[in-house]
């Protein structure tokens, strides 16, 4: 079977459903795919095919995730849906499925529940920039005032976590009715409205190539007569011959100039996001650069030792620790291409962290690493992964 050609004609946006168990995330995912297939072509998906989420691995952690694609007239969407709460936690922390926006599903019969709150908090911590709300099961609520009450609660909850609760689009509907093909206001028209809201409320994400240049250094070579070459995969932006660049992390930041870009032994004028290349550095000695540092556009990223993080700790069954860890625990933190030792500061009131938990913590590294909010890392102990995390706030 030939692979379908990926058409890059429309902007591509990543979204996902979040919310409490049994509030209708998977049913809504099926309804969106079905309605989008009717309005813009594409493949309708039924509940069963989305619910049987295949396993995948991200940073050594097994996660069950369903990927669904659909189109609106102006955009192409990739949508993730997870079967269980633990899968959401892992997915969001590892960044296995980075979301440009999330669809929060809240049952009108229950209102916000504990996982509703937790998913909003996680969205804030891991940097999901936009949330839209689908109030589900509205067809079984007779009392209009109750719907207004639930909507108010949801808006307050969003505002509690620094999302613009008052301005967030909230759509009332019924995923089940939409899947049945109902043309009543809570049926397919509500899902059409949701698709319009996704198009208008979630801005088009900035492409990696349009961001500032950043390349994690994987290897360093010395080429006689030409100088020092560092190799790696360009994470974002473009580096051109003649550009001033900084070497950031582990040691004091150094300035240098790119005097050449090589790929597959060919000389190029530039290296772009997604490409593996070698960058020739003017006047930089081989011993001044090491794996774990990054090349970056001057001033675009700074090195830090202290940060707050949201962390998922692997369970024993996932190959993680068998015992909890306490305050002051000192594992290795694996950022991009290297391990750095760091000490953990648990929040007041948290005595220990059990395998399988997700937790907020402070970290202090022994060497500074180039980092920004949203950077993912693994926590390792003797070479095996025991956790995954994301930088929630950079401190110093």
UniProtKB/Swiss-Prot annotation:
Renumbered residue ranges of the record's region G1: 19-26
Start and end residues of each stretch annotated as G4: 136-139
One GO location term (cellular component): cytosol
Segments for region (G5): 174-176
Boundaries of every tr-type G domain copy: 10-206
PANTHER family: ELONGATION FACTOR TU, MITOCHONDRIAL, ELONGATION FACTOR TU-RELATED
Species in which this protein is naturally found: Psychrobacter cryohalolentis (strain ATCC BAA-1226 / DSM 17306 / VKM B-2378 / K5)
Enzyme Commission no: 3.6.5.3
NCBIfam families linked: EF-Tu (TIGR00485), PRK00049.1 (NF000766), PRK12735.1 (NF009372), PRK12736.1 (NF009373), small_GTP (TIGR00231)
Subcellular location field: Cytoplasm
Known function: GTP hydrolase that promotes the GTP-dependent binding of aminoacyl-tRNA to the A-site of ribosomes during protein biosynthesis.
Binding residues for Mg(2+): 26
Region (G2) location: 60-64
Pfam families on file: GTP_EFTU, GTP_EFTU_D2, GTP_EFTU_D3
Region described as G3: 81-84
Protein known as: Elongation factor Tu
Family: Belongs to the TRAFAC class translation factor GTPase superfamily. Classic translation factor GTPase family. EF-Tu/EF-1A subfamily.
Entry keyword Hydrolase: yes
Catalysed reaction equations from the record: GTP + H2O = GDP + phosphate + H(+)
Residues annotated as binding GTP: 19-26, 81-85, 136-139
